[in-house]
């Protein structure tokens, strides 16, 4: 039954609020890092996770303009004022409330149980929007769509040094508008 439902599911769709989603069919991921691995943290252990259910993930980050449809008074930060930039300064609770809001807009069951504006539990049988789990997020960042391709350590590859043009990171042009930036790095997305 699950396989039949998966075949009928669209590979991608756009929500009524304009957010695009893509269906992902994950499998196995090795999470964590070896003790000898550079950057390994004391609380990290290697664990195998088998992701058995497909899930939808937003194709892009939620933008300021989209998040402000839910919460008009969101602080975008002093310098990060473009409506099409990713929403920032959002708590986990607000992100979960956004998921519930989007679920309501789409006529779906809310995933997060809430009392007022506070998340107090989960509805695991819900068909509504939710944040990705840690394993889903790690699989998305570290895997390829190609079957049999080895997992990578970082979205840009296995080298700790970020490759030029790999993404819109806080490079030196962000100095003064963000708390942390990558020194001696230009990502090509200067503002």
In which residue ranges do the predicted regions lie?
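Short solvent-exposed loop/turn micro-motifs enriched in small/polar/acidic residues
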Residues: 5-6, 41-42, 188
């Amino acid at each position: 039954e699950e396989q039949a439902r998966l075949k009928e599911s669209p590979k991608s769709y756009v929500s009524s609020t304009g957010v695009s989603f893509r269906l992902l069919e994950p499998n196995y991921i090795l999470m964590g890092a070896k003790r000898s691995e550079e950057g390994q943290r004391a609380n990290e252990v290697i664990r195998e996770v088998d992701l058995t259910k497909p899930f939808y993930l937003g194709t892009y980050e939620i933008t300021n303009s989209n998040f402000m449809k839910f919460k008009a008074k969101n602080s975008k930060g002093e310098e990060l004022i473009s409506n099409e930039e990713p929403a920032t300064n959002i708590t986990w609770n607000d992100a979960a409330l956004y998921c519930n809001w989007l679920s309501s807009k789409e006529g779906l069951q809310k995933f997060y149980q809430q009392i007022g504006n506070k998340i107090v539990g989960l509805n695991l049988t819900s068909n509504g929007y939710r944040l990705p789990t840690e394993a889903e997020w790690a699989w998305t960042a570290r895997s390829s769509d190609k079957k049999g391709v080895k997992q990578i350590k970082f979205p840009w590859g296995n080298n700790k040094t970020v490759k030029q043009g790999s993404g819109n990171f806080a490079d030196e042009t962000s100095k003064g508008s963000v708390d942390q930036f990558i020194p001696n790095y230009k990502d090509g997305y200067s503002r």
